[in-house]
């Protein structure tokens, strides 16, 4: 079903692979959206009215340093604040469609230990957008052999990190963005979650590993993150959280 003009989004796809670019544009057209494509960043920067776009989907592959066996496909999605206020439900559908399309395209037979993938997402602070992102990230980590989905609580840790950033960092303000970065390989998965909130004094966080704090309701999410992840680090201002997950055999 074609969406009405009021619900139609303007999407810019920047991708150097002809097949991937055409396929993704077709998928988004099928949802009823207006899609503009560019084969490289320089071409995209030459567009006259770049402010018209509600969503950007861009590859992040550095052709000078990456070869096909070493990197599958890195990409970035960024949504504007105006789009989040206008049609947050439609943005949810678009993001899940892009992630689903990418998942179908990149699963090719390659030695797992040579695959490296980087994902960057910029999303409005709305929790309804997060489930598809969570499922996608956990699936990618599982396919690289870092975890077994049925035995892992990685989904829980990432969910707690996203919820904390949206609710406590950005205070559910959809005009503020949540930035999520995932750097994935067969050896480790590094996740960074950054909000646009005012921050907080990291030193004031009760140590969730201290037995005196185990039964306190506050900080329960932080406790889960510390228990599930192998490394957890907050930035000095408290607006960025870095988490590392490794397979059992590679843990320090």
Regions found by a protein language model. Name each.
Residues 107-119, 166-252:
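Conserved beta-strand-loop-beta-strand hairpin that lines the nucleotide-binding pocket
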Residues 12, 37-55:
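Acidic, metal-coordinating helix/loop segments flanking the phosphotransfer/catalytic sites
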Residues 1-16, 20, 25, 42, ...:
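Non-catalytic signal-transmission and effector/linker regions of two-component phosphorelay proteins
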Residues 55-61:
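Active-site residues of response regulator receiver
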Residues 87-105:
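Receiver (REC) domain switch/output surface
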Residues 159, 163, 167:
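Short alpha-helix lining the ATP-binding pocket of the histidine-kinase-like ATPase
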Residues 26-31, 47:
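Alpha-helical interaction/dimerization surfaces of two-component signaling modules
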Residues 135-159, 214-215:
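Conserved short strand/loop->alpha-helix "switch" segment adjacent to the catalytic nucleotide/phosphoryl-transfer site
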């Amino acid at each position: 079903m074609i969406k009405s003009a009021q619900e139609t989004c303007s999407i810019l796809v920047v991708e150097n692979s002809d097949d991937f670019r055409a396929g993704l544009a077709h998928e988004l057209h099928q949802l009823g959206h207006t899609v503009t494509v560019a084969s490289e960043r320089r071409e995209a920067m030459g567009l006259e009215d770049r402010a018209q776009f509600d969503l950007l989907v861009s590859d992040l592959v550095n052709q000078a340093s990456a070869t096909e066996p070493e990197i599958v496909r890195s990409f970035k999605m960024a949504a504007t604040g105006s789009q989040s206020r206008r049609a947050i439900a439609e943005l949810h559908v678009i993001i899940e469609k892009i992630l689903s399309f990418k998942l179908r395209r990149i699963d090719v037979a390659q030695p797992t230990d040579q695959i490296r993938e980087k994902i960057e997402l910029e999303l409005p602070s709305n929790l309804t957008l997060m489930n598809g992102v969570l499922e996608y990230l956990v699936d990618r980590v599982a396919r690289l052999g870092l975890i077994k989905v049925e035995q892992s609580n990685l989904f829980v840790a990432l969910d707690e990190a996203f919820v904390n950033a949206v609710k406590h960092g950005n205070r559910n303000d959809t005009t503020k963005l949540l930035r999520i970065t995932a750097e994935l390989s067969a050896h480790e998965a590094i996740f960074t979650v950054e909000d646009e909130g005012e921050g907080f004094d990291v030193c004031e966080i009760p140590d969730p590993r201290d037995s005196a704090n185990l039964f306190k309701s506050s900080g329960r999410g932080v406790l889960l993150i510390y228990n599930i992840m192998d490394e957890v680090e907050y930035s000095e201002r408290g607006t960025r959280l870095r988490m590392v997950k490794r397979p059992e055999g590679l843990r320090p």
